[in-house]
From Swiss-Prot:
Its EC number is 3.4.21.36. It comes from Rattus norvegicus (Rat). The lineage of its organism: Eukaryota, Metazoa, Chordata, Craniata, Vertebrata. Ca(2+) binds at D85, N87, Q90, E95. Pancreas. This is Chymotrypsin-like elastase family member 1. Its cofactor is Ca(2+).
Amino acid sequence: MLRFLVFASLVLYGHSTQDFPETNARVVGGAEARRNSWPSQISLQYLSGGSWYHTCGGTLIRRNWVMTAAHCVSSQMTFRVVVGDHNLSQNDGTEQYVSVQKIMVHPTWNSNNVAAGYDIALLRLAQSVTLNNYVQLAVLPQEGTILANNNPCYITGWGRTRTNGQLSQTLQQAYLPSVDYSICSSSSYWGSTVKTTMVCAGGDGVRSGCQGDSGGPLHCLVNGQYSVHGVTSFVSSMGCNVSKKPTVFTRVSAYISWMNNVIAYT
């Protein structure tokens, strides 16, 4: 939320015509996901005043490791991960709650420059979760994999369902086809803000991420199987669902080696 406030203050101080990247993305223009249809999706929650609050999404990649966005985490806060959840406001009977034991942010991440990339972090859980029909590990792409333009993808999360709207209590999904780097980095889209280590998806002005989905997965259908190709990173500060401003994700396939090393040696 701090990053949201930073960008909001830029708008308040007379920069409303500029297009800053806005982190903390959420699902806009989507629909409620079928219960537990995305079993690698997690809710990252922080402790405040004795209560837990959803702040970001994430992806279960090992029984005791979660992948999320670097801008979602802080060493000054206490976090937990909830797996197997669908409705955050009620007990579904399928949830597992696990404390975050260690936060590993990519060493090149710069919290003052989200557009530089490296918006990825791994969370080591205090204990391994139990895999079942409601909790599964994500399939990750091979290192270096690049999505074809217009590849079918879905974003999922509990974020806002419209710009400046309320958080969703039930998991939402929205169809966001991928946008090729050559298009997304063109001057009529994101320009030089987008890097080759990112994935763009959507941009139709209707469906997008928005504040609250950050850190969550972009599930893409490749060779008949859904795999997580993106970590939700930022949207336009002009609004979540702005035409030709696709939701931008950290490209998972650019960080496979880094993640494998962190997991092996941490």
